[in-house]
């Protein structure tokens, strides 16, 4: 028989840098999960993606064991990395902070495809383009 899930925890953590300090410790500790076991496993599975923020969905079972699913990094993080900027514009309609090419946009859309609610790369590109526009990043051909 399948184990019963008692909690579903969603966190966004830097790849390869999870530690028991907040927000990881309190989120997992209240459900009785072995925090160090999670940190070691998360860091091992994300060590090749250092520098990105990787969202994780942790399922906690009634026997205090857990499993987790790694998601793709947020589109805003991928866009900022491609444009070479720290953060988006505070006023995206007036102040543009960077540029990405259509090829970079397609690459980001293909990376995000598993987590988006579409199977079409063109639709994914439009979704990511909207995020870029809201960050003050322009798309050059």
From Swiss-Prot:
Q: Which InterPro entries match?
A: Ribosomal_uL11, Ribosomal_uL11_bac-typ, Ribosomal_uL11_C, Ribosomal_uL11_C_sf, Ribosomal_uL11_CS, Ribosomal_uL11_N, Ribosomal_uL11_N_sf
Source organism: Synechococcus elongatus (strain ATCC 33912 / PCC 7942 / FACHB-805) (Anacystis nidulans R2)
Q: What is this protein called?
A: Large ribosomal subunit protein uL11
The UniProt keywords, alphabetically, are: Methylation, Ribonucleoprotein, Ribosomal protein, RNA-binding, rRNA-binding
Q: How does it assemble?
A: Part of the ribosomal stalk of the 50S ribosomal subunit. Interacts with L10 and the large rRNA to form the base of the stalk. L10 forms an elongated spine to which L12 dimers bind in a sequential fashion forming a multimeric L10(L12)X complex.
Protein task: Forms part of the ribosomal stalk which helps the ribosome interact with GTP-bound translation factors.
One GO cellular component assignment for this chain's record is: cytosolic large ribosomal subunit
Query: What HAMAP family does this protein's entry cite?
Result: Ribosomal_uL11
- Gene Ontology terms, MF aspect: large ribosomal subunit rRNA binding; structural constituent of ribosome
Q: Name one GO biological process term.
A: translation
Q: Which domain of life is it from?
A: Bacteria
**Changes after translation:** One or more lysine residues are methylated.
Protein family according to the UniProt entry: Belongs to the universal ribosomal protein uL11 family.
Q: Which gene encodes it?
A: rplK
SMART domains assigned to the protein according to its UniProt record, in alphabetical order: RL11 (SM00649)
């Amino acid at each position: 028989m399948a184990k019963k899930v008692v909690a579903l925890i969603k966190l966004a953590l830097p790849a390869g840098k999870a530690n028991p300090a907040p927000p990881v410790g309190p989120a997992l500790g209240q459900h009785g999960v072995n925090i160090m076991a999670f940190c070691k496993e998360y860091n091992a599975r994300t060590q090749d993606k250092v520098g990105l923020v990787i969202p994780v969905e942790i399922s906690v079972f009634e026997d205090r064991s857990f499993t987790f699913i790694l998601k793709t990094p947020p589109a805003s993080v991928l866009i900022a990395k491609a444009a070479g900027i720290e953060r988006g514009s505070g006023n995206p309609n007036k102040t543009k902070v960077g540029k990405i090419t259509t090829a970079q946009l397609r690459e980001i859309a293909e990376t995000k495809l598993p987590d988006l609610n579409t199977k079409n790369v063109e639709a994914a590109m439009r979704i990511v383009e909207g995020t870029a526009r809201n960050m003050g990043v322009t798309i050059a051909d």
